[in-house]
Amino acid sequence: MEIPIQVAVRIFPHRELKDLLRSFGPTEPKKDAQAVDEGADSKDSEAQVPAAEKDNPSISETDPNGNAEQDSAADSKTIPDANGNDSGQKDYPDSAYCVQAIPISASALGLPSALPGGDPMDSIAAGLIQVGPHTVPVTHALPSSSSQEQVYHQTVFPLITLFLEGFDASVVTYGQRGQGKSYTLYGNVQDPTLTDSTEGVVQLCVRDIFSHISLHPERTYAINVGFVEICGGDVCDLLGMGNIHCTNVDAVFHWLQVGLSARQSLPAHTLFTLTLEQQWVSKEGLLQHRLSTASFSDLCGTERCGDQPPGRPLDAGLCMLEQVISTLTDPGLMYGVNGNIPYGQTTLTTLLKDSFGGRAQTLVILCVSPLEEHLPETLGNLQFAFKVQCVRNFVIMNTYSDDNTMIVQPAEPVPESNSSAGPLSQAGPGDNFGLQFAASQWSKLVTNAEGLFSKLIDSKLITEVEKEQIEEWLFLKQECEECLSSTEAMRQQKQLVPILEAEEPEDVNSEAANSESPNSDNENDTDNESHRPDLDDKIESLMEEFRDKTDALILEKHAEYLSKHPKAVMQSQDREIEAQPPEENGDDRKVSIGSRRRSVQPGASLSTAELAMLNRVASQQPPPPIDPESVVDPLESSSGEGIRQAALAAAAATAPIEQLQKKLRKLVAEIEGKQRQLREIEETIQVKQNIIAELVKNSDTRSHAKQRFHKKRAKLEAECDKAKKQLGKALVQGRDQSEIERWTTIIGHLERRLEDLSSMKHIAGESGQKVKKLQQSVGESRKQADDLQKKLRKECKLRCQMEAELAKLRESRETGKELVKAQGSPEQQGRQLKAVQARITHLNHILREKSDNLEEQPGPEQQETLRHEIRNLRGTRDLLLEERCHLDRKLKRDKVLTQKEERKLLECDEAIEAIDAAIEFKNEMITGHRSIDTSDRIQREKGEQMLMARLNRLSTEEMRTLLYKYFTKVIDLRDSSRKLELQLVQLERERDAWEWKERVLSNAVRQARLEGERNAVLLQRQHEMKLTLMLRHMAEETSASSASYGERALAPACVAPPVQASSDFDYDHFYKGGGNPSKALIKAPKPMPTGSALDKYKDKEQRSGRNIFAKFHVLTRYASAAAAGSSGSTAEESTALIESTTTATATTTSTTTTGAVGKVKDKALVSFRPEQLKRLMPAPTATKVTRQKNKIIIQDASRRN
């Protein structure tokens, strides 16, 4: 079980000691004050606390929180501190308390208990320690006025109770130097100068342990003590003899005194261990063996350094202990070390491994100082104590069970005194552990010698005489083994000892823990088997062969049994089985009465191997089919028996119907899920085919746009080359820096436009690849749909078969019901009763004739005795039947029975069957037939014949005892089997529920995956439609452009036009007019543009670039939106992003184009004559109409989708 570590905080009584020192004489205060100041051994500093409590009654008075208060008469002027505690007298201002213990009622807070099923007072946090504004919850809050007995009974005594039951216990004292750690553990009994000594926790524990042992004289025990000291990483044995066996309290106290006297003066840790080993015989005659250890650790002072609180202790062992606690409580640190807790870094943590995170129930007693000058140290220790409470130990019982080992009670009674109780070696004649160990060692030596002799024979290095001696030795050894094995088998068959089974859950846990050693012994075997991967297959094949042969042998023996067995005996057995009222048995009692499996110990549960065997048998034996025609003949049984049999058949027929309905529901759910998936796949295929058709239909548009982009790219590349040549000329001729910058800007702009055109060309040429991918995806979807259709056809066929089978079962059940109704009618019952009476009359006549014939046979006195015994047995059987019917009626009425009544019901069943067997045997003796036992005696094996011979030699009392034991074992086995069947039914229900949930979730996941694929295909279709419209629009705008940017840029600066055309590419008529001076299209030459004019030119170029490449930015944004949608966003978010981007871009393009047209018109009216306006005026209306038309088409397509 998992139990948290408990923490008890004890406040050091500084104030009480000072009052005690003032009340002493002039010679004593020096010694005591020196002990208080030194603090090397805290037992000296607290040695006078009990005496102070006795001499000064004012000290023993406590407030409601359990804190000691000063006598009001001593000094009426006292100043309370910030926590409300009395700060003491004015003469001792340094004795002000800043630590307060606040006990809390655990039941009032509803806190959980530290022990499973324990008292609420033993809760995890039953007190608070208040240090200034800080409050720390602890398991036990002990005020400064607490005595040693109070500390022991409140904190340590529950651990000792568990220790006596076989659990490990650990008590650790922790705290600042000189605060009473050693005094809490060992008291001051080791100081001979003190007249009034006080015992510590260790002494009180030892007294309680021996007191408990004296109350159980039937147990043998052994107590060993050890005392070690850890100083600087070295372990020193204070006793000098290791673990020492002690027989009484005085011996333990003596060795404890020796160890305390041998301690060093340096700061060190001490560890006192007490081991208790117990053995006794249980009521069933089985050996109980338990071993538990109690450790008492006195750690040295913390003496923290560094940033306080908390700081870190100076001692390396304590520092590593705090690191271990942090690792156990912090999952991050535990993950960092991969679960390898650093216990082995220091000697202290290695020895305390079981105490912190191990298998012992641990109590940490923290001794703190209440003074303000020790406040940082106190806070650091309290933080460590709070972490310790979060650590949980896995406490288990240390029990050892010896199977098939009977312990004989010693003839001499064990005295109740402590001194007379001896060690385990004095356990009596039943203790043969030493003999067993010697026998095992002898066997190992013989085995080793045999191997050595075999090697010598093979080596051919010995003479013939030596070889003959070795062979003779091997022959004698083989004969000895055969004799021992036969004797051991005979001894085990004679004793018929029960099998040991664990009765308590704690024993189960302890056996699981103690099974580590045998598992470690078998590691070599496991390693050898791991090198043979085919071993499991061979074992499985052999098991199958064994099952087949066993089934064939059983069928053969059954047929032989039926052929040899008399028919009358078979009919009598059938009548006996039918005589028991089956309708009064509950649903949970459908267990075969005649079934026999191997017996187990009385009162014990089934082991794991037995559970596995029963599960396998249950899975391999399906319920027999119910034949509606197999109705009990009314002439062979009474009418009531026929009705009961028909009712039983109808109840048995209900079980397969329910199972079949359950399978049918699962199958229908699978079929519905696959049908939905098939519809989704078909819809996805249709959408993909639509996309392919649209891509094929718009392939001409894409190819036309691709050609346009290619031509435009060629023009831009030529213009870029020209611009680079002009830039080179300008650099060679050393022209003005502004001109060089202008050409550099032009080249950069052309390169960017070339990159954009390459991207658009690539987008326009992707239609072929997309068609291929879509066609491949359609093929995969069709293949998936075909697979689903095949599975659907199979499942539909299986559903039809199951429905037909279910209809047959329902018909058989209806037939059974009609049979019950027909037999339940009064007329039918009357006819059956007459037929039965006629049958009974006929049988009585036959029985009388048989009786007359039997009376003529010899031995009438013996036959009469047997008949008298049979009549007595029948009377007993009637009484048992009456009691069983009473229990069945109570079960039917109350729906539940007590454990005792359930066991009584099973005992009645078994007793009735046993009486029937005895009656049958006696009838066979009367009639002169040979029993089955005698007829098959010759065919028995030799070992079985020997067993029967030994059983025949048993006396009547021994045979009665043996039969009673096996009768009890059979009852226990039937009870365990019934419980196992109930557990199996519950597990099957849970399994069915989880299978149904798993099926529903898997169908939902597959459905969601298919829906997501269909949504992605729909989005792709929308994207392709919009992309086609964009490419068509851009191709039209590109074809409407008549000139390029490079021709305008390459024109001389002196003839640059002062105005711009209505579109970005309508500059051809300007440059053409520049070559004919007769046309008045060009104004007077202007000087080179200045920096401000060049900036305006750049701004204008940037605005003009938005007109043609806005659609390309739409495509780029859509690509990014589609990537984001595929990585985690939903389809709706991607669609919204595309539509918003398209709308915004269209609006921006319209605004830019309209503004440019207006400006061009205004400037053209100023610069040109009216006859030239018609030739220079562009056609913006067509472009605008095309754009509006495309926008309407996109919106209509979005609404249709």
UniProtKB/Swiss-Prot annotation:
Localization: Cytoplasm, Cytoskeleton
Transmembrane feature ranges: none
Self-association state and partner proteins as the record states: Homodimer (Potential). Binds microtubules. Interacts with ci, smo, sgg, CkIalpha and protein kinase A catalytic subunit. Interacts (via kinesin motor domain) with Ubr3.
Record bears the keyword ATP-binding: yes
Binding site for ATP: G175, Q176, R177, G178, Q179, G180, K181, S182
Highest taxon in the source lineage: Eukaryota
Name recorded for this polypeptide: Kinesin-like protein costa
Biased composition (Basic and acidic residues): 28-56
Residue stretches of biased makeup (Polar residues): 57-75
Native source organism of the sequence: Drosophila melanogaster (Fruit fly)
Record-level GO cellular component terms: cilium; cytoplasm; cytosol; Hedgehog signaling complex; kinesin complex; microtubule; microtubule associated complex
Similarity remark: Belongs to the TRAFAC class myosin-kinesin ATPase superfamily. Kinesin family. KIF27 subfamily.
